[in-house]
């Protein structure tokens, strides 16, 4: 059974999906069950993976890590998203980009997630 906002990865082809509607079935890709990406908040490498949120009014600035995360061809942040009162705002990134994003939000309480192509899903807030 899936839950809204869970992230799954195909360990065969690398497809990544985020659940937008919960269901009872199992997510399958390439003939194999997809792997649920567990959300990490603290662990080894925290200084380079946990999103750091700064706020000025309704502007939210997110950078990945208190020490900038590498953005190299083999190791980079694929996306950053902010969850704002049920709304999801996402910025896709690629190697060479800076590991940061800016969003306009309406609620007072937000959280941020970032996905590292090697170390998985990280969250703060």
Swiss-Prot record:
Free-text remark on how the cofactor is bound: Binds 1 Fe(3+) ion per subunit. The iron ion 1 is coordinated via 4 cysteine residues. Binds 1 Fe(2+) ion per subunit. The iron ion 2 is coordinated via four histidines and one cysteine residue.
InterPro entries: Desulfoferrodoxin_Fe-bd_dom, Desulfoferrodoxin_Fe-bd_dom_sf, Desulfoferrodoxin_N, Desulfoferrodoxin_N_sf, Desulfoferrodoxin_rbo, Desulfoferrodoxin_SOR
Keyword Metal-binding: yes
GO BP: removal of superoxide radicals
Keywords: Electron transport, Iron, Metal-binding, Transport
MF GO annotations: iron ion binding; oxidoreductase activity
Binding-site residues, Fe cation 1: 10, 13, 29-30
NCBIfam families: desulf_FeS4, dfx_rbo, neela_ferrous
Protein name as catalogued: Desulfoferrodoxin homolog
Taxonomic lineage from the root: Archaea, Methanobacteriati, Methanobacteriota, Archaeoglobi, Archaeoglobales
């Amino acid at each position: 059974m899936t839950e809204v906002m869970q992230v799954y990865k195909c360990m065969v082809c690398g497809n990544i999906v985020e659940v937008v509607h919960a269901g009872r079935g199992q997510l399958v890709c390439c003939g194999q069950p997809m792997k649920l990406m567990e959300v990490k908040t603290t662990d080894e490498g925290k200084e380079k993976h946990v999103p750091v949120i700064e706020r000025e009014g309704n502007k939210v600035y997110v950078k990945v890590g208190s020490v900038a995360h590498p953005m190299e061809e083999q190791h980079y942040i694929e996306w950053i998203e902010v969850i704002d009162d049920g709304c999801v705002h996402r910025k896709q990134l690629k190697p060479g980009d800076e590991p940061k994003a800016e969003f306009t939000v309406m609620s007072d309480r937000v959280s941020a997630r970032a996905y590292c192509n090697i170390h998985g899903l990280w969250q703060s807030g």
